[in-house]
From Swiss-Prot:
Protein name: 4-hydroxy-tetrahydrodipicolinate reductase
Main location: cytoplasm
The keyword Repeat belongs to this UniProt entry's keyword annotation: no
UniProt organism field: Salmonella schwarzengrund (strain CVM19633)
NCBIfam families: dapB
Protein family membership: Belongs to the DapB family.
EC number: 1.17.1.8
Keyword Magnesium on entry: no
EC primary class: oxidoreductase
Keywords: Amino-acid biosynthesis, Cytoplasm, Diaminopimelate biosynthesis, Lysine biosynthesis, NAD, NADP, Oxidoreductase
Amino-acid positions noted as binding NAD(+) in the UniProt annotation, renumbered to this chain: 12-17, 38, 102-104, 126-129
Gene: dapB
Reactions catalysed according to its record: (S)-2,3,4,5-tetrahydrodipicolinate + NAD(+) + H2O = (2S,4S)-4-hydroxy-2,3,4,5-tetrahydrodipicolinate + NADH + H(+); (S)-2,3,4,5-tetrahydrodipicolinate + NADP(+) + H2O = (2S,4S)-4-hydroxy-2,3,4,5-tetrahydrodipicolinate + NADPH + H(+)
Amino acid sequence: MHEAQIRVAIVGAGGRMGRQLIQAAMAMEGVQLGAALEREGSSLLGSDAGELAGVGKTGVIIQSDLASVKDDFDVLVDFTRPEGTLAHLAFCRKHGKGMVIGTTGFDDAGKQAIREASQEIAIVFAANFSVGVNVMLKLLEKAAKVMGDYTDIEIIEAHHRHKVDAPSGTALAMGEAIAGALDKDLKDCAVYSREGYTGERVPGTIGFATVRAGDIVGEHTAMFADIGERVEITHKASSRMTFANGALRSALWLKTKKNGLFDMRDVLGLDVL
């Protein structure tokens, strides 16, 4: 057993992402699985987290009460749903725990609650924890600065049939990266649906298209299209483990932070490129 630098609690431990996070925590140098949680009434309560995730017995028992494990972790890793994440945020703020938030679908009030909590605790909040996706966001900023003023920009994303929000948080982050590079607000230039007689494409807009099908882990493409040529920047994920590893890497990075709101570009040092 390697020496732990950070102890993590994983909420939603029985879900697809939760199990991957448990596997990643058990494998990553410097990380210790301190707690695993599921909703009250879940049939998984009382199970060993490692056995649930297929990595063998860990001695960490899945529980529903966050307060009962507050001394067992330093950073909470949350890939659940907005209402649950905000409740966990209030707990972590009260008890001085760091957070890694991969939940998507927050409204403006939820995002504001995260910003306010970050004045007291350290939070990494990202739409996508894949290293590749965050490199892509940096590439999109650079492409937008060169081509954004004269091309038609479209973002196409595809996910599995169980995803409940659209467009994906990553697609929105792509739009925000492009809009920011063009000194625009995404709210003012995004087009989220087209149906019926729409008229010609409005110049300067950023279009979004969504696919939900099968077991697609996540595919995102940004298109910069002109007459005679187009540039497409694409990322395809084939395993959730890429997100889990990025989230645990973020938890390790938080060990030296007392407070503040960060994203994966901070963790990876991409803003200096």
